Structures are given as structure tokens and as C-alpha cells.
Amino acid sequence: MPAKEIAFHQGAREAILRGVQTLAEAVAVTLGPKGRNVVIEKSFGSPTITKDGVTVAKEIEVENKFENMGAQMVREVASQTSDKAGDGTTTATVLARALFEEGLKLVAAGHNPMDLKRGIDRAVEVIVAELKKLSKPTQGKKDIAQVGTISANGDETIGNIIAEAMEKVGKEGVITVEEAKGLETTLDVVEGMQFDRGYSSPYFVTNPDRMEAVLEDPFILITEKKISAMADLIPVLEQVARSGKPLLIVAEDVEGEALATLVVNKLRGTLHVCAVKAPGFGDRRKEMLKDIATLTGGNVVAEELGIKLEQLTVKDLGRAKRITIDKENTTIVDGEGKREDIEARIKQIRAQIEETTSDYDREKLQERLAKLVGGVAVINVGAATETEMKEKKARVEDALHATRAAVEEGIVPGGGVAYLRALQALKKLEVPEGDQRFGVAIVQKALEYPARRIAENAGWDGAVVVSRINDGKAAHGFNAASEVFEDLEKAGVIDPTKVSRTALQNAASVASLLLTTEAMVAEKPKKKGAPAGGGMGGMGGMDEMDY
């Protein structure tokens, strides 16, 4: 085991502080609408230019090992906030630094770090409860657009596109972000349920120009079995043919005699039919087939359920208003399943999302939920260069997370004002005499930092701006974009409550841990070994040569 270096007490905490300050300062310059860009060197390719706090934080490593530990702890604050709320990473970093700096002054003056931690925890609980009281639910497209705009660093186009996407697919809908080929940022919406399986044979196509099959008001046969013998299908096909409606067959596979017979009947015009493979694999396939059955009001043909293909009637088949099938995808629009059955299925999937510990499973469950609820939207991000594309795509993803957070827990005034208003609740907080009170005072002071830093980045005196905000009431604060004092809610300067809450909780958690640190252990840097053996005789002067 390599030898270790150990730092103790105040020396250890001061090393942490230097690391925290280094990282926090690089991140804090990006805060607010007048925040500056940070240019990050890459080992290959062009540098990255960003105004995203977590992107900056992830790139920072400090040479001194003890200082680097402090920097990495604050980086964790930014990452955790980004993962949970999607935004607020810079605010969380600024708060973590403020809480640690203010706390360290008191520890150096002889106050008990454990009591300070208890005071910080009590104060944060009260502030979080007050933020929830200040919170208002989002009302319509306008609020969502404003949250998206602020999170995307003031880009109204991004805010409006996200609001439009959420309006079309609903708050449970899937919204994905992809790179566009051109300069324009556009929105594509797929309504209904879409799964990534196309027709089994191009002979099923009804529109040769677009190479797609469109079935109007069709029946849908859903089975998890392979269909190869035609005899199993004949009874139900005869019933469908008599009705004059089209038929979509969703099966593990349709092959051999069955596929050939279906194609011949389609070409002759006897039966308007199309076959597609079932989506997914294994148990996930079974669940997706049940989703399709629930959405369309049909039954899944499965022997374990006692339903056989040859015994099917049209009552067992699903129905939909329209189905479009191309080479790669099948889209079911307006399935005719019972509303209460669909709601029960949605509730079941939501419960599974809550219970699962796997990120992959959660993502797949959310996709299934979105397909049942409303649809999928794709935001295609356009830009002139690859560097701009990366930066813009990251902003769109941040804005998307922030708008989801706003819909989930509501909104509060932005610009750091919500924290300053929530401070009123600390006046009523009863804390035992002693160092816990100083812990509460640390939080009181730290909560001024976000508003102060936003003002400083806009070229104003932070202390003066905070004083003027404190003189105002409710949502009255400093709009750094227009550099005026006004009602921030009316001006559209709002933050998701979840973002403000998560940023404070994560910052307080890490700052408390750092304040109660008494020792640090790091590996000693390895001494460089002696240079390789001496050169050959007669080679003097080699080290003066130019290469």
C-alpha cells in the first residue's frame, strides 16, 4: 500500500476551502442572464464554450490533492442537482460555497461544528417548507415557456418550442432532443402510440409514393406467438372480411404459408391486411403487447391466458381510428380501449416506475407510459457549427428538465428572490441557545449569495441590490436581463420550486459534511525515479543539442 499524506483540523478545512473556491468561482461566472461564458479545452477537437454550470464543474480538477477533494465534493453538489432537478447547478454551487465559507469562519472562531450542522439542517428544513408555501402551480403554456427560456439562458425560441411540445404530448409524454441537419430548431410530434417495428412485407403498402400502409378504422389482432400455418387464422379472417374493415396483425412473426396467403389476399383486394412483428423482447414484449391491447380494447392471444388463435372472434380484436405502418415504425392513433382500463394500466406503470431501482428499466417504463398517455415529441436542434450544436443541445436538455420540474412542483419568483422571501420564516424558528443559532445565521447569510452574484455578473453592486430586494415585497426583485426592479413573476423571471429546493438541500448536505471534517487522507505523490542509465562515452554535449 502506498504511503499517505494526512492533513488535520483547520489546515485540512482551509485546503478544502481553496478547492471549493476555485471550482465555485469558475462556475459562478455563468450565473444569471448576464452570466459569462467559460471556454473549456478538449484533448481533441475544438474547445467547448458553455454557460452551463455542471458542464464547467465536471471539467475541473485541481493539482493539490486536498484542494481537489473539496472541489470534487462541490462538483457532486452540481451533478446531484442536475440529476434530480435538471437545472440549478450554478445556484447549488454558489450556495455550497457560501455555506462552507460562512461556517468555516465560525469554526475558526471556536464554535462547535456539530452544533453548526444541526442549526443548518433545522434552517434548511424551514426554508424548504416556506418555498413550498410560496410555490404556485404552472398555469398554461406561458409559464412553461418562461421557465424554459430562463433555463436555456434567455433563449425564447427554446422556451417556446418546449412549451409547445409539452402542450402536444402532455406532461407524461416523451420529449427527446436530437441534432438537426440544418440551422433551424424544429419540433416533430408523433401522436398516438408508436413502436419501432415496420411491415413484414413491402407488398402490404397502400401508398407506394410514401412506402407506407395506412389502415382506416381497422381491427387489430395481437398475439405473442409466431404465425406460420394459415389454418389457425382462417376463422377470424373470414369474420373480418365480412365486416369489410382492414386488419393489422401484431405477432412475434408472420412467416411461410401464413405470410404468403395474406400477401396474395391483399394484392387481390379480398382482404385489406398488414402484418408487423411485436415490439420489444422477452417479458418487456409481453407487457408492450398488453399496452397495445389496453389502448385498443382488444385481448392478447396467449395460451397461458387460455385464448387460442383458432377460437378468436372479432370481439377479441382491438380497434383504432387509424394505423400508419412504414418500413421501420407502426403508429396507432385513437385506440378504442376503455378509458378506465387505460387509466388502470397507467397507474400500474407509474407504480412500477416508483419501485424500480434500474435507470434502464425506469427509462423503458417511462417510454411505455408516454405512449399510453399521449405521444412522443422530438426537438431537432439546429446550429451553424459543431461547438454551437453541443452547447445548444445541452441548454435544450437543461430547459426540458427544468420545465418538467416546474410542472411537477410549481414555480417561485426567480433571481434569488424566493430565497430572500423565505428567510422571513427563520425569524419564527425556535432554536436552543448556543451554536445551533449560529448555524441558522449561516443559512440566513448564504441565501443572499445567489441574488448578489446575479447582480454582480450584470455589473451591479450585489449588496445594494439585495438591500433593495429586501425592501420590496412578494415577487418584487431585480430583473438582471432588463436591469430594472419589478415584479419578477409578471416579467416572466421564475424558477421551478423543485430546482430551488434541491439546490439548497444538496448544497447544505455537502457544506455540513465539509464543516465537520477533522482529517483528510491522500496518497503521497510518487517521487520520480532516477533517469535511465548514462549515455555512451564520447556522447558529451547531447543535452545541449536541438531536436
Curated annotation (Swiss-Prot):
Superkingdom of origin: Bacteria
Catalytic activity as recorded in UniProt: ATP + H2O + a folded polypeptide = ADP + phosphate + an unfolded polypeptide
BP-aspect Gene Ontology terms: protein refolding
Residues bound to ATP: 30-33, 51, 87-91, 415, 479-481, 495
Gly residues: bias regions: 531-541
Cell compartments where the protein resides: Cytoplasm
Molecular-function GO term, any one: ATP-dependent protein folding chaperone
Pfam families tied to this protein: Cpn60_TCP1 (PF00118)
Broad class of enzyme this protein falls into: isomerase
UniProt xrefs under Gene3D superfamilies: GroEL (3.50.7.10), GroEL-like equatorial domain (1.10.560.10), TCP-1-like chaperonin intermediate domain (3.30.260.10)
Any GO CC annotation of this UniProt entry: cytoplasm
Region described as Disordered: 525-547
InterPro entries associated with the record: Chaperonin_Cpn60_CS (IPR018370), Cpn60/GroEL (IPR001844), Cpn60/GroEL/TCP-1 (IPR002423), GroEL-like_apical_dom_sf (IPR027409), GROEL-like_equatorial_sf (IPR027413), TCP-1-like_intermed_sf (IPR027410)
Keywords, comma-separated and alphabetical: ATP-binding, Chaperone, Cytoplasm, Isomerase, Nucleotide-binding
EC nos: 5.6.1.7
General function of this protein: Together with its co-chaperonin GroES, plays an essential role in assisting protein folding. The GroEL-GroES system forms a nano-cage that allows encapsulation of the non-native substrate proteins and provides a physical environment optimized to promote and accelerate protein folding.
PANTHER family in the record: 60 KDA HEAT SHOCK PROTEIN, MITOCHONDRIAL (PTHR45633)
Subunit-level organization: Forms a cylinder of 14 subunits composed of two heptameric rings stacked back-to-back. Interacts with the co-chaperonin GroES.
Homology family: Belongs to the chaperonin (HSP60) family.
Record's protein name: Chaperonin GroEL 1
Organism whose genome encodes this protein: Anaeromyxobacter sp. (strain Fw109-5)
